Amino acid sequence: MENIDDLWNKVLEEMKKKVSKPSYETWLRATKANALQNNDTIIVTAPNEFARDWLEDHYSGLTSDIIEQLTGARLTPKFVIPQHNQEEEALPEQTPQTPPEKDVAGQSTLSQTMLNDKYTFNTFVIGSGNRFAHAASLAVAEAPARAYNPLFIYGGVGLGKTHLMHAIGHYVMEHNPNAKVVYLSSEKFTNEFINAIRDNKAVHFRNKYRNVDVLLIDDIQFIAGKIQTQEEFFHTFNALHEESKQIVISSDRPPKEIPTLEDRLRSRFEWGLITDITPPDLETRIAILRKKAKAENLDIPNEVMLYIANQIDTNIRELEGALIRVVAYSSLINQDMNADLAAEALKDIIPNAMPKTLTITDIQKLVGEHFQVKLEDFKAKKRTKSVAFPRQIAMYLSREMTDASLPKIGSEFGGRDHTTVIHAHEKISKLLATDQELQQKVQAITEQLRQ
């Protein structure tokens, strides 16, 4: 059989002919074939878990058919995500592995880092909730072991801790190619330590992690309660710190709140700088969605990004997942994206989504309270800015948050034409993309209406 990369490129070319362009761009363009397994399975990487599941459900059969047409052999695709995205999603043994690790510092760096190419400082969106953590991470990357050592980053799931750790690793390696950088989770550290003891390779294990320039260890809270692992990490920490090697640690909570963590480890974690990351505000959430859309070559209307940003304020992972879901839904039903479609796509994962039973009068009353406009003025012919602009906001929200048709909305605003409603919606949508003060006002009104 021909080279697997060439084969997969041919498969993708055939896919372009058989699926819509949005579907191809959303699901297939970023895939890559890695290896053959047992001569009957082709291993294909997808960019994330959602894409992997979608590909399995919708494109497995078509993939097999195309491969059979091209080669005469029927292969079953197995869609996986890269190991650096999810360690437990281990690729099979037949998958080409990175070069063997060497214990000599400065060699085989890439084989140990397992860094995600997408997680760099350039792709990190800075906001009020992560500004200090970003600055500290950049300082550490620019001057390892001279700025803050250790650097301890904590925060909830999906807020960017891992992104910053990978960014530090990339920056160090870019500016010092001979540096030995290792990134791993504390769970992996624990598993490797257990295996090393079982296989009588404790010395090899210690050499591996005590002869590095930068150690990036994620989710340190998982070693809590594991006495032997804590003992080993304590000595690893000491060895690196004494040699002025940089240590960066992440957790879902500060050291003092990690239960069953030994006091001697807790005190060492507090030697350097402790910084937290909090959930992103509305402006940051919109910026994250824009950057994600740009990175994925997706054309997402502003109203859709605003809708998603208003609905999901927990973490970045859920925010980006919601965007992918909306894109997928739009591709599946072959309809253009708008706020109504986004609401439909996300109704199963957002239990408190904007209620469609809301009335236009409810919206007019609340907008009027915020802008000191009387209810009757929304229906009057007044065109002064103090009335016209709030009226346009109310029209925009009526379009976003109710099922009312354009003529119906127009009639509720003094019998105005549906084109007036369209103009108001377009105007406010554009302003929301750039006007932070307006974003805050509309968000406040939206949240009140949701309640």
UniProtKB/Swiss-Prot annotation:
<dbReference type="InterPro" id="IPR003593">
    <property type="entry name" value="AAA+_ATPase"/>
</dbReference>
<dbReference type="Pfam" id="PF00308">
    <property type="entry name" value="Bac_DnaA"/>
</dbReference>
<keyword id="KW-0547">Nucleotide-binding</keyword>
<dbReference type="InterPro" id="IPR027417">
    <property type="entry name" value="P-loop_NTPase"/>
</dbReference>
<dbReference type="InterPro" id="IPR018312">
    <property type="entry name" value="Chromosome_initiator_DnaA_CS"/>
</dbReference>
<dbReference type="InterPro" id="IPR020591">
    <property type="entry name" value="Chromosome_initiator_DnaA-like"/>
</dbReference>
<dbReference type="GO" id="GO:0008289">
    <property type="term" value="F:lipid binding"/>
</dbReference>
<feature type="region of interest" description="Domain I, interacts with DnaA modulators">
    <location>
        <begin position="1"/>
        <end position="93"/>
    </location>
</feature>
<dbReference type="InterPro" id="IPR038454">
    <property type="entry name" value="DnaA_N_sf"/>
</dbReference>
<dbReference type="InterPro" id="IPR013317">
    <property type="entry name" value="DnaA_dom"/>
</dbReference>
<dbReference type="GO" id="GO:0005737">
    <property type="term" value="C:cytoplasm"/>
</dbReference>
<dbReference type="GO" id="GO:0016887">
    <property type="term" value="F:ATP hydrolysis activity"/>
</dbReference>
<dbReference type="GO" id="GO:0005524">
    <property type="term" value="F:ATP binding"/>
</dbReference>
<feature type="binding site">
    <location>
        <position position="160"/>
    </location>
    <ligand>
        <name>ATP</name>
    </ligand>
</feature>
<dbReference type="InterPro" id="IPR024633">
    <property type="entry name" value="DnaA_N_dom"/>
</dbReference>
<keyword id="KW-0235">DNA replication</keyword>
<comment type="similarity">
    <text>Belongs to the DnaA family.</text>
</comment>
<feature type="region of interest" description="Domain II">
    <location>
        <begin position="94"/>
        <end position="113"/>
    </location>
</feature>
<feature type="binding site">
    <location>
        <position position="161"/>
    </location>
    <ligand>
        <name>ATP</name>
    </ligand>
</feature>
<comment type="function">
    <text>Plays an essential role in the initiation and regulation of chromosomal replication. ATP-DnaA binds to the origin of replication (oriC) to initiate formation of the DNA replication initiation complex once per cell cycle. Binds the DnaA box (a 9 base pair repeat at the origin) and separates the double-stranded (ds)DNA. Forms a right-handed helical filament on oriC DNA; dsDNA binds to the exterior of the filament while single-stranded (ss)DNA is stabiized in the filament's interior.</text>
</comment>
<keyword id="KW-0446">Lipid-binding</keyword>
<dbReference type="GO" id="GO:0006270">
    <property type="term" value="P:DNA replication initiation"/>
</dbReference>
<dbReference type="InterPro" id="IPR010921">
    <property type="entry name" value="Trp_repressor/repl_initiator"/>
</dbReference>
<dbReference type="GO" id="GO:0003688">
    <property type="term" value="F:DNA replication origin binding"/>
</dbReference>
<dbReference type="GO" id="GO:0006275">
    <property type="term" value="P:regulation of DNA replication"/>
</dbReference>
<dbReference type="InterPro" id="IPR013159">
    <property type="entry name" value="DnaA_C"/>
</dbReference>
<keyword id="KW-0963">Cytoplasm</keyword>
<comment type="subunit">
    <text>Oligomerizes as a right-handed, spiral filament on DNA at oriC.</text>
</comment>
<feature type="region of interest" description="Domain IV, binds dsDNA">
    <location>
        <begin position="331"/>
        <end position="451"/>
    </location>
</feature>
<dbReference type="InterPro" id="IPR001957">
    <property type="entry name" value="Chromosome_initiator_DnaA"/>
</dbReference>
<feature type="region of interest" description="Disordered">
    <location>
        <begin position="88"/>
        <end position="108"/>
    </location>
</feature>
<keyword id="KW-0238">DNA-binding</keyword>
<dbReference type="Pfam" id="PF08299">
    <property type="entry name" value="Bac_DnaA_C"/>
</dbReference>
<feature type="binding site">
    <location>
        <position position="158"/>
    </location>
    <ligand>
        <name>ATP</name>
    </ligand>
</feature>
<keyword id="KW-0067">ATP-binding</keyword>
<dbReference type="Pfam" id="PF11638">
    <property type="entry name" value="DnaA_N"/>
</dbReference>
<dbReference type="GO" id="GO:0005886">
    <property type="term" value="C:plasma membrane"/>
</dbReference>
<feature type="binding site">
    <location>
        <position position="162"/>
    </location>
    <ligand>
        <name>ATP</name>
    </ligand>
</feature>
<protein>
    <recommendedName>
        <fullName>Chromosomal replication initiator protein DnaA</fullName>
    </recommendedName>
</protein>
<feature type="region of interest" description="Domain III, AAA+ region">
    <location>
        <begin position="114"/>
        <end position="330"/>
    </location>
</feature>
